[in-house]
A protein has these predicted regions:
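Conserved beta-strand signature within the Rossmann-like core of class I S-adenosyl-L-methionine
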Residues: 143-149
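A short acidic, Gly/Pro-enriched loop at the edge of an enzyme's catalytic core
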Residues: 104-115
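Short alpha-helix
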Residues: 167-182
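Conserved class I S-adenosyl-L-methionine
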Residues: 1-44, 60-64, 83-86, 243-267
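A short glycine-rich, Lys/Arg-flanked "PGG" loop and its adjoining helix->strand segment in the class I
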Residues: 129-141
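Class I SAM-dependent methyltransferase SAM/SAH-binding core
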Residues: 50-105
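Core SAM-dependent methyltransferase catalytic element
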Residues: 194-233, 266-270
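Short, glycine-/aromatic-enriched active-site segment of Class I SAM-dependent methyltransferases
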Residues: 150-166
Length: 270
């Protein structure tokens, strides 16, 4: 299934979503505290670091990066021109380099960056192992990669909807992809928005690894299987519609629990 786990379909998905991404999506599903907790794993402790943000979208994660690193040393990469156009309007990101590109075939030389960050992009990658191998390739020895993404659901309905939408990997899959690419010193932490309830499955993961050696990834990567430029015909258009509907089902859930949490806080203040 995973109707949006395809580059062309994801491109169309974000053509629509980009119009309200910062206003409606991030406040529900990818908040500033989540972002900051994830970026802590990246050791962005030197303003002179060269940082690549893959699947950067409208620049929400990039905004957290440039709070720690000089903007002119940061590169945003995304396949969606609509998302990047939104990012270009943000004053804090004016000096950031912005490129269209493919996470599975990064348009950079080997060992070009000190840090690699990708948040909320892996779920759209047809071949996550290839993309993480590319992260290893473009990092210099001693560099760190941070990948943030959703985790597999155990509830039957939530799992059916998420699997119809896009990729929700298991935690051990994230670890295996990092290790197979050659990353060591793996660190991970769970991240979740305020409305996510204790006792539920872990919402998402931030996982980081370090590249110790020079050279190619430990696991040779196959060529990309598809491109965002592939034609979106009737079958793919149907998949796009079904996947979008499955993803939209999560929005009222998030809104409901967000409202409950705010009412609870308001009641405590009275």
């Amino acid at each position: 299934m995973r109707f949006i786990q395809h580059k062309a379909e994801a491109l169309w998905f974000y053509r629509v979503v980009s119009m309200g991404y910062d206003r409606w999506i991030n406040p529900l599903f990818w908040t500033a505290p989540m972002r900051d907790a994830a970026l802590e794993l990246g050791a962005l402790d030197d303003p002179g670091l060269e940082v690549l943000d893959v699947g950067a979208g409208t620049g929400f994660t990039t905004s957290g990066i440039v709070a720690r690193v000089a903007p002119e040393r940061v590169t945003m990469l995304d396949q969606s021109p609509h998302q990047l156009a939104r990012a270009a309007r943000k004053p804090a990101l004016r000096a950031v380099r912005k490129l269209r590109g493919d996470a599975e075939a990064l348009p950079f030389a080997d060992e070009a960056f000190d840090r690699y960050v990708s948040a909320g992009s892996i779920e759209y990658w047809p071949d996550p192992q290839r993309a993480i191998a590319e992260a290893f390739r473009v990092l210099r020895p001693g560099g760190r990669a941070v990948v943030v993404g959703p985790l597999r659901r155990s509830h039957p309905l939530a799992r059916a909807l998420s699997d119809a939408w896009m990729l929700f990997p298991a935690e051990d899959e994230y670890v295996a992809w990092m290790q197979r690419a050659g990353f060591v010193e793996i660190e991970r932490r769970h991240v979740a928005p305020p409305w996510w309830r204790p006792g539920w499955d872990a919402y998402g993961i931030a996982i980081a690894g370090r590249k110790l050696r020079s050279g190619p990834p430990a696991l040779a990567a196959a060529p990309p299987r598809e491109a965002a430029s592939e034609r979106l015909g009737p079958v793919r258009l149907g998949r796009f519609a079904l996947g979008s509907l499955a993803g939209a089902a999560f929005i009222p859930v998030a809104l409901w629990f967000t409202a409950r949490e705010r009412l609870r806080r308001w009641g405590r203040r009275r």
